Amino acid sequence: MMKARMLVLLSLALGTPSVVLAQAPVQLKFSRVVDLTLPIESNMAPIPGLKPYLNNPSRVNVISSITEAQKEALRAEGMTLSGDHEVNGRSMISVLSILVHNGTHIDAPRHMVENGIPIDQMPVAQFVKEGVLINLPGKEPNSVVTVKDVAESGVEIRPDTIVMINTGWTDKMWRKPGFWEQMPYLERGVAEYVANKGAAGLAIDVFPEKPLWRGVKLDPGEVWIANHLALMQKNLPLIQFVTNLSQIGNNRFTVVAAPLAIKGGEASPVRVIALVE
């Protein structure tokens, strides 16, 4: 636990490779840091029935270790050792293979919009914003997060904030049977409601669309990716499968969501933290 409040001055910049527009420094005061990110590991739970997930399981392959003792410790921790793993006396080295939409990740507009902005071209200032937390911990398995839930939560969605919706599902069910099969989901219109309030993005701990893999049907004329589109057509990011949101409490906080700068990419794994005042 930190004994004193910390003051961090972040100077953010926006621009293109040829033009950089300096912004005024952003002053952030916080007393603690909450990690909102699921760990990346081998065999992360895929969305049932979706081939991109099933055909591309996550892998963290350790190809070398320093000593035999380290190798056995890694094995005991559940790490995946490559078939050609070697003990080299020098260094541990790993190779990561992951579908970029697995675990805690951020979607850029290019994910759902043909000419959308790729993840590496989104302004980095868009990933450091004041956060707004909407707690909906009473959501039961297979339930729906509705526009009414969000509108009547008593939480003001301020412009230029990242809205975070907490059902507690990922905290309770990650790595457990039923994680996908009973997961609550967002009603069509939730993301549009948030975007129309002037939010800078949306972060959630569940899947944002109807779970077709368990037989939930679309309404006539309904587009399955409606919540994705509501954000991405406005160049707003969508962050999925955050965790530990309940640790923020009722405090003001700043969200820092740092994706990898994957050239031309539509999404990225992301380390999300909350700087809590």
Give the residues covered by each predicted segment.
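Bacterial N-terminal signal peptides
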Residues: 8-17
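Active-/binding-site microenvironments in catalytic and ligand-binding cores
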Residues: 22-277
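Bacterial N-terminal signal peptides that target proteins for export
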Residues: 1-8
